[in-house]
């Protein structure tokens, strides 16, 4: 347990570590140490090589779009989460650490790679990026070792809990058992049970809810910004009914519940279009870029202030932490956020060339998994080679192969695939 705890209301259990450690420097909180460990991790650096929505090189030939990566998204999510969390009484370093950690388990090629790895790992427990994040934080990322092996970054209970978006194992979603979303693999259950001690059922802690909303806000706003920069989105299309209906179709069942009336989504979109800061055109000029940046700032402020006000209205002015409250996001605000996500899906991810690229990416991941399985331990990094040699059975060895692939960047996955298969 840390010798220096953050100010109340975080109790000693919240700042405990799975493997107890002495405090190295007085005056530094446990959550500040957690944040620093994540910032200095190789896993965070690797996110720079993982695409967010628009891959480098996909921008307009007229200007340098510098599209976001998973790393820049995580940094922006952390900034949004830190400020919203602080406004609601959370420890800001704790929320920032959770935001920085939330995508660490993301495999190459994003959710597309996640689907391909899940298919490959079906007989060893599947693959889910959030469960992989927990595995990375508590096992794979080298920082602390005990007699029983690696404990990963050995973060505090509260930080691990705040980084856990889906606090249940595969097939145990509290409302939809068939949901593909889960947050822990079977062989990581001991540390999961420890971090969830005294947690009420499948509830996420308040800081995890702040992290989750910060993630939604950051990627909904910035994915649209990147789509505009790259020339994939024409804001004027959102004024025409056929295009609007296509956006609403993309939202229903994906970002809002099935059966949501298109009229509710139309009202949400119209509220955004009516704002005087909404970008009704974009030509890449400096004034246009400034207007677009102002729009992104306005949207982030709009979404965060709505959540802050609604949560304060429900719980008052005290410090809201751990399991003392639920983040309240007005339905109208969630609808506005969902519409932005759907705009990015409709105009960026559903482009014909993107469909072809995603098919190619799935082939790369599937062939790479088979090639590594056939050659292992050859082809594995030294860290994973040792884990493969120590694995108790075929199921455990397959999980090591999955861990290796999940650690790769987009470019290193393609490079290793080409080297092992002979296919470019």
Curated annotation (Swiss-Prot):
Keywords: Hydrolase. Residues 70-220 form the HD domain. SUPFAM superfamilies: HD-domain/PDEase-like. Residues 20-31 have a biased composition (Basic and acidic residues). Transmembrane segments: none annotated. Residues 1-31 are annotated as: Disordered. One of its GO terms (biological process) is dGTP catabolic process. CDD domains: HDc (cd00077). InterPro entries: dGTPase (IPR006261), dGTPase-like (IPR050135), dNTPase_2 (IPR023023), HD/PDEase_dom (IPR003607), HD_domain (IPR006674), PHydrolase_assoc_dom (IPR026875). The keyword Hydrolase applies. Residues 1-10 have a biased composition (Pro residues). NCBIfam families: dGTP_triPase, PRK03007.1. This is Deoxyguanosinetriphosphate triphosphohydrolase-like protein. It comes from Streptomyces coelicolor (strain ATCC BAA-471 / A3(2) / M145).
